[in-house]
Amino acid sequence: IIVDLDGSSGQVNWGGNVVFNFTYAYVFMAIKSMFAPDIPNNDGCGSPITLKAPEGTVVNCKFPAAVAARLVIGHFLTEIIYRALSVFAPNKVIAASGGTPAQMNVFYGKRRNGKPWHSVIIRGGGMGASTSSDGNYVYIFPANGANTPVEIIESDTPLIIEKRELLIDSGGPGRMKGGLGQREVFRVPDDQYAPQSPVNLGIQAGRHIHAPEGLFGGNPGARAQFLVNGVPGNPFGLTQL
């Protein structure tokens, strides 16, 4: 199998660049999960795969390049390959997932006593359906990660989680339904435990403009939303809470 990424955009001046080994990992993962999911990973599994990724592109950047947000591009490689091969192997792929890419929320500020605090919170969305089953709920795919537990967030930060719940009807409808996403509500306390103002939030995510697409006539899932006091936030700027 030859995967040719020629024509990919050139590397960018922000952190979305992907190094070759990251690109290869998600290409490998997609193909192996389709054709040999039960074989333990080993070097021989990759021997039938040839990856062509031109140097200097966003999928094979040259030093120096910022790569901290590489998942914003790299996580879509698996989805792209599934879609490309769905014509030939429809029973071995899944539709697009709401947890692609994994959503990272970076909260930071100062506690009441002046001590800095900082926390990275990871969340997933609904997983795409296959031809034989509905998608998993609240899943981080294709990354090997997990949703940050509420107990960790509240013990590590001054924030309060008022709500974490499945988002009804967020999965794409079809013969097989996409998995449900989640709604999570954070509150900055205003009591004796309140941190100093401002509380800053950085969001690294996707799906707020383009919804995860269905396959074989299935409908797309819901788009992501980021609200501050009930009002949509600016997804391209720094918002202080």
Question: Where in this protein do the model-derived segments appear?
Answer:
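Glycine/proline-enriched, intrinsically flexible loops and inter-domain linkers
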Residues: I1-L241
